[in-house]
Regions:
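Post-DEXD/H (motif II) to motif III coupling segment of the RecA-like Helicase ATP-binding lobe
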Residues: 73-133
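Conserved helicase ATPase core of P-loop NTP-dependent helicases/translocases
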Residues: 21-36, 55, 207-209, 217-226, ...
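Interdomain linker/hinge connecting the two RecA-like lobes of the SF2 helicase core
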Residues: 116-216, 220-227
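Walker B catalytic acidic pair
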Residues: 69-70
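Long, largely alpha-helical accessory region at the distal end of helicase-like NTP-driven motors
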Residues: 318-380
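Conserved RecA-like P-loop NTPase helicase motor core
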Residues: 44, 74, 231-341
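Conserved helix/coil segment N-terminal to the catalytic DExD/H
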Residues: 22-65, 76-81
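Conserved helix-turn-beta segment of the N-terminal RecA-like "Helicase ATP-binding" lobe
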Residues: 1-23
Length: 380
């Protein structure tokens, strides 16, 4: 809202959703061609409301420009109804318009918006212009033998579910994938490794964001840091808005360490962040692209950003199906590492790590497809 007013001072804005209810009576007249001719008009709507029939039916769709931020979200079954809006002009914005492991949703997006604008503006084009350059460091994190056993047991169940369902992903199958992923995300060794990284690298005045899996892990890490004399602040969606605002103001004014779950993946913009520590990460490329983008935003006196990433590995190369997990972890790191200042140094680290587990870094890099690697995890 504030940005629209800043760049288009004469614009009239009708807000929809998040407590705004006046639109229910005014949307039809606000978007009529008669009123639109008097001044620039924008309907600023949240997706949850804009995808409902009662919004679409009241919206005058003549001479309409439809702009969708984070357009990948529109392809979900929950929001796909929004494609009923028959706008003459359509623009979808996203660093990752393809939906992870959702061909139907991706097709719905591409069918509606039809074409990708060329040339595609990639991260390599933005570095040094809209984004700062960055260093990328990986840190090996070992699963315990017990965690490896849990992973292998879950893999057996997933393999049976895959064989039973073929390509169709039942709710039970997806739930098994999620349960197995949490074993890696919540690995016990991550807290001690992350604590040591901050002990060695954090300096007062820096602005760090740490991505955790859940509140329990976030609190465990906060306590571990406190025991080492390092203060941190929690930031998550269930916090009261005033508390969130206070945390961000303190962070902007004095720096520090914010512990977050997924709250900073979309929607919260803090350009002053100069360091990121990734404790928990999905295999979904959208997540690492968004996280990298959050850290690389330009800010006053910010010369570059630094990203630390925890890579999960088994305790030995003979621990069964867990080695395929390491393959996906390395693939994520390969993609994160592209265009980093220290790309060659980190690539050497990844190469040594791959060889340790009888993996070929070049083969992993050539495959470079999370959907196919996910099949490795499923069928092994």
């Amino acid at each position: 809202y504030e940005e629209l007013k800043k760049y288009i001072p004469m614009v009239k804005i009708l807000q929809v959703g998040q407590g705004a209810s006046a639109w229910k009576d005014n949307l039809s007249s606000f978007t009529s061609l008669t009123n639109a001719a008097s001044s620039p008009r924008v309907v600023l709507a949240i997706l949850n409301t804009a995808s409902k029939d009662n919004f679409i039916e009241k919206l005058n769709q003549e001479n309409l420009i439809f702009v969708a931020d984070e357009v990948h979200r529109l392809g979900s079954k929950k929001f796909r109804n929004i494609f009923k809006i028959d706008a003459d002009y359509r623009l979808g914005l996203s660093a990752t318009p393809e939906r992870f492991r959702d061909e139907e949703g991706t097709k719905a997006i591409l069918d509606y918006f039809e074409n990708k604008l060329e040339p595609i503006y990639e991260i390599k084009d933005a570095l040094g212009k809209a984004l700062v350059h960055y260093d990328y460091h990986v840190h090996e994190c070992l699963l315990s033998f017990e965690e490896c056993e849990q992973w292998n047991d879950m893999s057996e169940k997933i393999s049976k579910a895959w064989n039973a369902n073929g390509q169709e992903e039942s709710d039970g199958y997806v739930a098994l994938l999620s349960q197995r992923a949490k074993i890696a995300k919540k690995a016990e060794s991550k807290i001690s490794k992350a604590t040591s990284i901050l002990q060695e690298n954090y300096d007062e005045g820096q602005r760090w964001v740490v991505y955790c899996e859940e509140e329990v892990q976030m609190e465990e890490f906060r306590i571990a840091l406190k025991e080492e004399g390092i203060d941190s602040m929690k930031f998550y969606s269930e916090m009261p808005l005033e508390a969130q605002k206070g945390t961000l103001e303190k962070f902007e004014n004095f720096g520090g360490i914010i512990l977050s779950i997924k709250m900073l993946d979309e929607g919260v913009d803090i350009p002053s962040i100069d360091h990121a520590l990734i404790i928990a990460s999905d295999q979904n490329p959208r997540q690492y692209i968004q996280r990298r983008g959050r850290v690389l935003r330009k800010s006053d006196n910010k010369q570059k950003a630094v990203i630390h990433d925890l890579i999960i590995t088994p305790p030995s190369s003979e621990t069964g199906k867990v080695c395929n997990l390491t393959k996906t972890e390395i693939l994520r790191a390969i993609n994160f590492n592209k265009n980093a200042i220290n790309e060659m140094q980190t690539k050497n680290v990844l190469d040594k790590l791959a060889k340790k587990y009888n993996l070929d870094l070049n083969q992993i890099e050539e495959k470079d497809d999370f959907n196919n690697v996910e099949e490795d995890l499923t069928e092994d």
